Regions:
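Intrinsically disordered, low-complexity, mixed-charge
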Residues: 1-93
């Protein structure tokens, strides 16, 4: 049986103003991952992801590549317990 996990992910680089959040949302839907993504005031992007471990890992790997016009310098991951409280993946503000 596959394990459900959660992850808090911080992405650094040229990740704001380059459609990173919208593309992350699209990728999350493709992987079946739920949660949210938002810009931070420090220029980074933060996401909270939940789903099957392999799907969350795939979305984290996607974040390392980013959207076509972004430049990802670093991806920091903090694994969390699966809460099950999300039903979709949203861009938040």
């Amino acid at each position: 049986m596959s394990e459900h996990v959660g992850a808090r992910v911080i992405i650094s680089g040229k990740v704001q103003g380059v459609f990173f959040r919208a593309e992350t949302q699209k990728a999350a839907k493709g992987y079946g991952v739920v949660g949210w993504v938002r810009n931070r005031t420090d220029g980074k992007v933060e996401a909270l992801m939940e789903g099957l471990r392999g799907d969350v890992e795939a979305l984290i790997a996607w974040c390392g590549e980013g959207s076509p016009v972004s430049r990802v310098d670093q991806v920091d991951v903090q694994w969390k317990e699966y809460s099950g409280k999300f039903t979709r993946f949203e861009v938040t503000y």
